[in-house]
Amino acid sequence: MVGLGLITPTAQANPTTTYRGTLGDTPVELALTYDSQYGGGMSGYWFSESERLPMALESTPFHPGSALLINIMDNPTLPATAVSLQPFAEGAAALQGSLVDLRTGTQQPLQLQRVTRFGGSQREAFEGELLQPVFDRDFYFSVHAARKAGEEVAQVDSIRVISRATGKRVQEISGQWCLSSVGTRTLTFGHFHAEARMDFQVQGYRVGEADGRVWCSPTQYYLYSRDLRTYRRHPQLEQFAVDGDLRFSPSGQMEFSKQDFINYDQRTRRWDYYRVITPERLEYLSSGEERF
């Protein structure tokens, strides 16, 4: 469960810059996120129109003034491809380098131009699209986000579901959500019910009436409806998330617990188990206890 959370000005401290270019004749997109913690590091995603699958980049140490070689996580245990950028400067207007086959050493020239910088400083305004890396056989996802200069939190106003087969948008969900401090992780994916396609959750965006501060809450859940072939919100899951803790098993079972279910004397915690039938229905299955 992700509960209510006030986003502070430091929450947007990881700037992400998107770039576009071509690899041969194929359009490609690269997003690089800079994390200043632990001496500095880069992460992000790689996207090629030939596959239409945003793939995460391996988090890689980076020191200003040095070149960057960053693996594409096409294989989580043994990446086969990397992006080499030399020279490299974080947030640069243009990048050049190559796509490297790590098995053969073959390199393909790569030239990229900056599209949008989703800035870390409150002084920076921005507007643009960010893909959300996840493996799904049918779809990929993007969010449209904007922030005015001086604002603390960037706002997402649309979530787009795009066909991997055609590259065309099949659904656009409008609303108000917070852009995550790492913008490429704004959508959190998982299997929330027994359906092969990915479901996702996202943090809402609301302004406090008393002080005007932005709150990134509540958590919203979107589940794929096979009958309607669209993603739909699940209000019951959202209420459970407000009341306690949620977790999901690989089989699509939802498990719920709350403070009242904890027995500190016996060091046990009760969990109620549910099956998600549709984006509107839950079925209670049973309860069980776990020791802690």
Please provide the spans of the model-predicted regions.
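N-terminal signal peptide c-region/cleavage motif recognized by signal peptidases
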Residues: 8-10
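Repeated scaffold domains used in trafficking and secretory/extracellular systems
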Residues: 182-188, 239-246
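Acidic, small-residue rich beta-repeat scaffolds with periodic aromatic anchors
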Residues: 13-18, 37, 41-49, 63-155, ...
